Amino acid sequence: MLSNHYNIGVVEAGCDEAGRGCLAGSVYAAAVILPPDYANECLNDSKQLTEHKRILLRQEIERINILNASILAMHRALDQLKVRPEAIIVDGNRFKPYNDIPSTTIVKGDGKYLSIAAASILAKTYRDDYMMQLAEQYPQYDWQSNKGYPTRKHRDAIREFGISPYHRKSFNLLGDTQLSFDF
């Protein structure tokens, strides 16, 4: 059973993202505040934009790199909360300060805390829906199955058909060194 809160007695938001490790598609993030007495045995880790908006998001991801895009997406999700959290817990090991709210990163937090698990499920399911819509336009990449992740079939399709407008063209995987994919 997951823990209800990391910080007892404060309004806490759990944050997570989906899609950072993908070759295609946008990063989605969610922030969730749960009541102090919330319980749900089913809640656990989870492993309608216009085309123009999706392309703008892809360009933003490439410009600021995928990690920073993930953090920005989480900040934007926090901006949408109707209640201001007193603390933020984030799945993973990196997060940039959000306003003046204390934050804690928790590796595998989506398997430890309910609010992060809920945020993870929201981010993943919304992103999966988005990738299913794109799969209708680009069936050759098998996005209905791989959701943009770098499976063998997906990489083979890139080699055969080239990249789509939704593929990421670069990743910042090695610190300041930019790594470009040449398929």
Predicted features along the sequence, with ranges:
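RNase H-like, Mg2+-dependent phosphodiesterase core
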Residues: M1-F183
